[in-house]
Amino acid sequence: MLLVLIRKIYTIQTKQMNSTIHIERLALHCYHGVMPQERIIGAMFYVTLHIDLEVKDEAILDDNLAGTVSYADIVQSVREEMSVSSALLEHLAYRVGHKLITDFSSIKSLNIRIDKENPPCGVNVDAIGVSMSMIR
């Protein structure tokens, strides 16, 4: 009875609930880069995502995964796309973001950042990265 009452109040007060999923510095060893040795040796890449999506009542009121997106499914999609070699981080970030928006219909927008650890750029730098925003 109480859950029914809460659901009625929630439905009256909100038409749509949005949420942001944060995945910070997902670490993956991958083979991306302009130089041939980068595609042979590989490097550590760190993917950070801020994903805005619509959350349904099942997740908020019923504690049911069916009302949102599984973090594990997001990570799996990122891993799949990161396994395909690219020369440019810009191209890679676009591909990963596009895959997520394509795979998960509840995603409204996302911000993606991909950092490459110790890139071969002639200077001592911890990482170089690219950020990109995408809207459905």
Model-assigned labels for residue ranges:
Residues 9-136:
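N-terminal, polar/charged subdomain of small-to-medium soluble alpha/beta proteins
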